């Protein structure tokens, strides 16, 4: 149940924050929250996470859709097995919610809205954060299995 709640909250928070910024900031506008450390900066990202590989919207939409289907099958397979790993399922739900959040943007706008700007890293969004956290959790799981 927690997985579903987090899944829904990530998508809702991601979309609400992007809509709020889309309606109140213009492209390139940067609002300091903590000057020189953290800004809200409106960026239209036609690439993937953190602005990599720009102007490939159709390709990344197709890849995102494929990844979403793959993750759903992975979650269903995990739940079918008797040795369920809750950390892995939680991580997959995080990645799934982030992928869906960004795919919604690609369908609506043809790009992803990024806005979290820590000034030393490319601008990103809540969906990117969920994907990254999910991947880190899977990496932790893999390291644990490796050293077991």
Predicted regions mapped to residue ranges:
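Alpha-helical transmembrane bundles and membrane-interface segments of multipass inner-membrane proteins
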Residues: 1-148
């Amino acid at each position: 149940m927690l997985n579903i709640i987090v899944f829904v909250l990530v998508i809702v928070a991601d979309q609400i924050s992007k809509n709020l910024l889309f309606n109140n900031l213009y492209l390139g506008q940067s609002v300091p929250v903590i000057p020189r450390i953290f800004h809200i900066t409106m960026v239209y990202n036609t690439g993937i996470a953190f602005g990599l590989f720009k102007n490939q919207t159709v390709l990344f939409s197709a890849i995102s859709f494929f990844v979403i289907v793959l993750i759903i099958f992975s979650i269903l397979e995990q739940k079918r097995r008797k040795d369920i790993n809750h950390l892995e399922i939680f991580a997959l739900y995080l990645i799934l919610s982030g992928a869906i959040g960004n795919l919604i943007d690609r369908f609506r706008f043809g790009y992803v809205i990024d806005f979290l700007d820590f000034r030393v890293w490319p601008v990103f969004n809540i969906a990117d954060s969920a994907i990254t956290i999910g991947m880190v959790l899977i990496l932790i799981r893999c390291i644990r299995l490796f050293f077991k």
